[in-house]
């Protein structure tokens, strides 16, 4: 009977070891949960970025305001009749 109890105890320890420390055990599960959380956060950020890009593309296709703003900011263009003033900081 003692041999049977000893055998069952060893089996229990072996199974517990695999549960806690083995491949696909609780440690791996915890690591995977953290990885999934990081991936979901990254996906959320990318979705927001995509939405902003789609909005900008729609604005560029449909309206002239966005095109005008880009021409002013990126190319330094001005409308007819406008005067462009550039303020240069004083060098000490």
Swiss-Prot record:
The chain crosses the membrane at residues 4-21. Residues 22-92 are periplasmic. Keywords: Cell cycle, Cell division, Cell inner membrane, Cell membrane, Coiled coil, Membrane, Transmembrane, Transmembrane helix. It is found in: Cell inner membrane. Residues 1-3 are cytoplasmic. Residues 28-62 form a coiled coil. It is a single-pass type II membrane protein. One of its GO terms (cellular component) is cell septum. InterPro entries: Cell_div_FtsB, FtsL/DivIC. It comes from the Bacteria. The keyword tRNA-binding does not apply. One of its GO terms (biological process) is FtsZ-dependent cytokinesis. It holds the Pfam family DivIC. PANTHER family: CELL DIVISION PROTEIN FTSB. Part of a complex composed of FtsB, FtsL and FtsQ. Belongs to the FtsB family. Essential cell division protein. May link together the upstream cell division proteins, which are predominantly cytoplasmic, with the downstream cell division proteins, which are predominantly periplasmic. This is Cell division protein FtsB. The gene is ftsB.
């Amino acid at each position: 009977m003692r041999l049977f109890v000893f055998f069952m105890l060893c089996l229990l320890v072996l199974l517990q070891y695999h549960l806690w420390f083995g491949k696909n055990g609780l440690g791996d599960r915890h690591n995977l949960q953290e990885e999934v959380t990081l991936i979901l956060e990254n996906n959320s950020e990318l979705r927001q970025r995509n939405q902003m890009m789609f909005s900008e593309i729609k604005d560029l296709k449909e309206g002239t305001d966005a095109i005008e703003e880009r021409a002013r900011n990126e190319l330094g263009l001005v409308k007819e009749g406008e005067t462009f003033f550039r303020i240069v900081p004083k060098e000490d």
